[in-house]
């Protein structure tokens, strides 16, 4: 029955609590009305009870505050802490007593040991559970007693006691403690700790406990065994018989090594190993190293071999190593053939790699237990967490739910060597395949727990339901802390690296490129100015700086920028700038995707003597031969070629700086903005010589990564730098759109040079041409009226100039004597000017009528006249005859107008029709068609001339129709019959079909519609004999000229 606390103790605790809360006046009411005896009873008091005694809410708040101070974890937590303190005091007392007993008495009297029941039989004897009554008190401790027969003890009692004294001083959490020995005439008893769960081999063989030993628990056991053996190794003790049967299980998470040192103490030696070859004994030869079998040489390295076999035995769940083989066969396989045990199904790949190292045939090549413990966290099986539920129908697949942990055993199982499925184990011990895409990495494996407590079983079902729920909630919170959360806020999931090492996404994306507007780098090439370390950095060698103020681009305060480690450049050769780079430009720390050939060095305009900054880039970049690490995880490593490209001096880049974009610098203390535009007066020290041409060379892409610092403090000076100003202005120039036209961009052209200049142009230091100011903000603007007027005037001047040149070319082509063609006599017939005749004779009229009849018969034939000679008139005179049956009228030959006028006969009253063809430029060609419509006529082929544009004129029957063949015979005087045209090449003809609209037959080109019906067409004139004779005379002259 629980003891009640005394009144004095109760009054003291309650009175102390009320005095601390300044509520002593409520003590009598709390004791009398609420029946409180001590301060601990306040945990059962509710707010309504305190209100009933008149305590206000502020007073209740003060009472709760003082109560929390007195009982931090509640009354039950206080009681547990008290019990723990008492238990620790008892443990210390017992330890001190035990130590005293161990130091003074290693031998335990036999009357203090009471054997209870036999636990099993071993190689050296039987094992019993017994009670040991300690001399320090009356309590009885449950211990394990191993009884060894005197016939098996070959050594003397004194040496055995010396070894027992050494073993009793061993203190380790994973080594079974030996309390002492009991000496008797018949047998010797070894008193040690009691493991109620038995040996590890027995637990692995029990099917009911198979689920209690999943893969992750076995990994913990392997590490604990290695830690215990490492302790024995440091104590220079050799186990000689390490196996799963000698590993005791104290709890589901704790194992300890037992029976260490007994092989040497018991003196088994050669007789023991000879007995292994007999068929009646269990042979531990499968756990022995080759040197132990061949030379009976036991060392810590032989224990390492046995440790590997023990771990293999554990992951195979108690299977016998080299099962079915004799000792001689095992020695043949291990010593001569050097074969190894195959990997168990539940053994992770990394653990099996460690086992193969322990089975190295050469003793010196095996690792020590200290090495195994140091490297074991890296070899521990990795766990993944399921993100979806999986219930595959396949029998060899795992069935798991979301948030279940899976231990990865193999990433390339034999069924799926491509890694599409992995092989793993659930927490309940089930093995099977699963898809890695259904899982995520689980950060932080559960550390091995060794609380040193002894439990009676592995089941935890005895706990209450409420306690289990609370534990589940706490474990859920712990699991959530170990997982990577989803992207929150503006964070973007740009890339992912899987548990198997595969990655996808934007791995090369610089995080500075994801900012609203990134900062452009600017490296100070000057050797005179070295920036001071930023006071925002924790170390002077750190390349990560914090931004002091809000930048102009909207970067928040104290934003950390990751930078590359560029050695000396991070402290001496880098200045911090706040220039604005193009929004769509590539991040400076990201290397270009192509390599550009190295351009020849070019000269840079010299600056004024007031501010001379030497450009010594080659010396500063000479230390970049080494490979460098990067603080930015997404940035690629620096290659050797990229490091060599950084050595090249940047003096080869020629930049032009407009006068309105020059930059002056102000003190950091006066203005937070480091750079200030000054469109007016420009400082002489910051003025650079610009290009003489308004067109600027494009900046070639960098050939390697660019190291840059993106933030700086106020205490870093900002000297004027040529490269900074040039880079800033060139970026602004590139920002301007090509649609921002001006007079210089439209009218500045030439046919004898390309539109884009080469990049090798040198800058003339004598010329200081400054382009007109242009605003960087206005990308597209309207042209002013003055600019439009200037453009029109210049265009008109260019057109007039072109017309003059074209007219001169035509005049040169029409000069006589340059080009001679045999068709000139035939063409001269149409251009020969005949004098005007006053009348027609009767013979001429008869001949003309005959010619008209011949033309009527040949009206269907459409033969083009021979081409005209370039020496002839530009536009020939076309004789048109009237089609009307009215009386004939005399023909008035028109005057030849040079190049521009076409003369035609229209009526008997000697009217002339002048058609003027105006050609202003080669771009505009006016084709004027003059039509005299006639019903039977169907058109006429145009004159083919390569110097004049073709035009079509429908004519009457027989007019302007000359066949290229010999001229038809007409009635003429005798003198004209034997005159034949000279032999010549037939002219090139091209037929152009002419379509006449019958609905417009009444249309006249001069008088309009209906005029043709009212005015009768004229009578065809009578040809004159002199005209025919002129044709023969011209032919005769041409022959004479040709001869």
From Swiss-Prot:
One GO BP annotation of this record: embryo development ending in birth or egg hatching
- The UniProt record lists the SH3 domain at 379-444
Organism domain of life: Eukaryota
Q: Where is the composition biased (Polar residues)?
A: 610-624, 825-842
Specify residue ranges for compositional bias: Low complexity.
516-543, 630-644, 870-884
Q: What class of enzyme is it?
A: transferase
Positions of the UniProt region annotated as Disordered: 443-481, 514-644, 790-842, 859-898, 932-993
Q: Extract the PROSITE patterns matched here.
A: CRIB, PROTEIN_KINASE_ATP, PROTEIN_KINASE_DOM, PROTEIN_KINASE_TYR, SH3
Q: What is this protein called?
A: Ack-related non-receptor tyrosine kinase
Question: What effect does gene inactivation have here?
Answer: RNAi-mediated knockdown in a gap-1 mutant background causes a hyperinduction of the vulva in 60 percent of animals. In addition, suppresses the slow germline development of clk-1 mutants.
**CRIB domain residues:** 484-498
Tell me which cofactor or cofactors this protein depends on. Answer: Mg(2+)
EC number(s) from the headed UniProt entry: 2.7.10.2, 2.7.11.1
This molecule's function is given as: Probable tyrosine protein kinase which plays a role in vulva development, probably by acting as a negative regulator of the let-23/EGFR and let-60/ras pathway. Involved in the negative regulation of germline development.
């Amino acid at each position: 029955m629980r003891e009640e606390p005394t009144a004095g103790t109760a009054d003291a605790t309650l009175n102390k609590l009320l005095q601390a809360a300044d509520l002593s006046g409520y003590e009598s009411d709390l004791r009398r009305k609420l029946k409180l005896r001590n301060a601990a009873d306040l945990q059962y008091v509710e707010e309504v009870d305190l209100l009933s005694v008149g305590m206000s809410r502020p007073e209740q708040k003060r009472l709760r505050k003082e109560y929390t101070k007195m009982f931090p974890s509640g009354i039950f937590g206080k009681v547990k802490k008290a019990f723990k303190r008492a238990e620790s005091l008892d443990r210390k007392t017992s330890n001190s007593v035990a130590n005293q007993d161990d130091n003074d008495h290693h031998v335990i009297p036999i009357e203090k040991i009471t054997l209870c029941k036999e636990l099993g039989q071993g190689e050296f004897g039987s094992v019993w559970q017994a009670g040991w009554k300690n001399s320090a008190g009356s309590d009885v401790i449950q211990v394990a007693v191993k009884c060894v027969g005197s016939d098996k003890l070959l050594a003397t009692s004194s040496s055995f006691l010396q070894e027992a004294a050494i073993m009793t001083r061993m203190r380790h959490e994973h080594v079974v403690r030996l309390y002492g020995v009991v000496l008797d005439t018949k047998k010797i008893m070894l008193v040690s700790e009691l493991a109620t769960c038995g040996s590890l081999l027995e637990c692995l063989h029990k099917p009911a406990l198979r689920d209690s030993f999943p893969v992750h628990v076995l990994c913990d056991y392997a590490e604990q065994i290695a830690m215990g053996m490492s302790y024995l190794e440091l104590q220079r003790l050799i186990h000689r018989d390490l196996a799963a049967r000698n590993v005791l299980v104290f709890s589901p998470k704790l194992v300890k090594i037992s029976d260490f040192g007994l092989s040497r103490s018991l003196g088994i030696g050669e007789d023991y190993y000879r007995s292994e070859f007999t068929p009646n004994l269990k042979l531990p030869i499968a756990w022995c190293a080759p040197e132990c079998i061949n030379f009976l040489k036991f060392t810590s390295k032989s224990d390492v071999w046995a440790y590997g076999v023990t771990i293999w035995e554990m992951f195979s769940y108690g299977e016998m190593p080299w099962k079915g083989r004799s000792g001689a066969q095992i020695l043949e396989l291990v010593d001569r053939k050097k074969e190894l045990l195959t990997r168990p199904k539940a053994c992770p790949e990394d653990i099996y790699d460690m086992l193969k190292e322990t089975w190295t045939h050469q003793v010196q090549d095996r690792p020590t237990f200290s090495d195994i413990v140091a490297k074991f966290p890296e070899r521990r099986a990795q766990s993944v967490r399921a993100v979806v539920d999986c219930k595959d129908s396949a029998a060899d697949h795992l069935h798991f739910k979301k948030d279940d942990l899976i231990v990865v055993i193999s990433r390339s199982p034999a069924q799926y060597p491509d890694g599409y499925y992995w092989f793993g184990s659930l927490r309940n011990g089930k093995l099977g395949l699963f898809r890695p895409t259904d899982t995520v990495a689980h950060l932080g494996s559960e550390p091995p727990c060794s609380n040193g407590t002894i439990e009676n079983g592995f089941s935890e079902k005895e706990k209450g339901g409420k306690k289990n729920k609370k534990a589940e909630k706490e474990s859920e919170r712990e699991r959530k802390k170990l997982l990577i959360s989803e992207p929150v806020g503006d964070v973007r999931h740009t890339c992912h690296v899987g548990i198997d090492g595969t990655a996808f996404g934007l791995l090369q994306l610089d995080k500075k490129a994801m900012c609203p507007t990134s900062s452009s780098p600017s490296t100070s090439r000057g050797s005179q100015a070295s920036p001071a370390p930023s006071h925002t950095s924790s170390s002077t060698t750190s390349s990560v700086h914090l931004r002091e103020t809000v930048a102009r681009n909207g970067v928040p305060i104290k934003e950390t920028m990751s930078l590359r480690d560029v050695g000396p450049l991070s402290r001496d050769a880098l200045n911090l700038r706040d220039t604005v780079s193009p929004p769509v430009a590539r991040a400076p720390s990201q290397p270009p995707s192509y390599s550009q050939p190295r351009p020849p060095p070019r000269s840079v305009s010299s600056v004024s003597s007031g501010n001379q900054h030497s450009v010594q880039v080659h010396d500063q970049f000479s230390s970049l031969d080494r490979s460098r690490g990067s603080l930015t995880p997404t940035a690629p490593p620096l290659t050797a070629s990229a490091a060599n490209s950084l050595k090249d001096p940047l003096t080869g880049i020629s930049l032009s700086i407009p006068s309105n974009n020059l930059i002056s610098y102000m003190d950091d203390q006066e203005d937070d903005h480091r750079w200030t535009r000054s469109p007016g007066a420009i400082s002489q020290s910051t003025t650079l010589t610009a290009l003489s041409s308004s067109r600027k060379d494009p900046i070639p892409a960098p050939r390697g990564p660019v190291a840059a610092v993106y933030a700086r403090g106020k205490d870093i000076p900002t000297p004027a730098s040529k490269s900074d100003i040039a880079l800033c202005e060139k970026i602004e120039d590139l920002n301007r759109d090509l649609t921002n036209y001006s007079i210089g961009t439209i009218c500045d052209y030439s046919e004898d040079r390309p539109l884009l200049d080469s990049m090798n142009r040198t800058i003339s230091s004598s010329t200081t041409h400054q382009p007109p100011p242009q605003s960087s903000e206005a990308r597209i603007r309207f042209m002013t009226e003055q600019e439009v007027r200037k453009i029109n005037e210049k265009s008109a001047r260019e057109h007039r100039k072109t017309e003059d040149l074209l007219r001169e070319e035509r005049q040169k082509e029409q000069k006589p004597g340059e080009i001679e063609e045999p068709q000139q006599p035939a063409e001269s017939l149409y251009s020969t000017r005949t004098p005007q005749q006053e009348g027609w004779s009767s013979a001429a009229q008869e001949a003309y009528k005959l010619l008209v009849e011949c033309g009527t018969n040949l009206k269907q034939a459409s033969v083009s006249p021979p081409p005209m000679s370039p020496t002839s008139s530009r536009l020939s005179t076309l004789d048109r005859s009237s089609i009307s049956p009215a009386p004939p009228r005399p023909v008035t030959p028109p005057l030849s107008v040079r190049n521009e006028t076409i003369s035609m006969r229209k009526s008997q009253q000697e009217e002339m029709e002048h058609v003027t063809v105006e050609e202003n430029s080669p771009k505009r060609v006016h084709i004027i068609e003059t039509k005299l419509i006639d019903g039977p006529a169907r058109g006429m082929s145009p004159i083919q001339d390569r110097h004049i544009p073709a035009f079509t004129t429908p004519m009457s029957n027989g007019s302007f129709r000359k066949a290229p063949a010999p001229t038809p015979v007409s009635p003429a005087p005798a003198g004209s019959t034997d005159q034949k045209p000279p032999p010549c090449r037939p002219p090139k003809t091209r037929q152009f079909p002419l379509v006449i609209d019958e609905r417009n037959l009444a249309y006249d080109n001069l008088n309009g519609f209906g005029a043709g019906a009212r005015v009768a067409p004229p009578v065809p004139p009578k040809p004159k004999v002199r005209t025919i004779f002129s044709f023969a005379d011209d032919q005769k002259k041409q022959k004479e000229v040709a001869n």
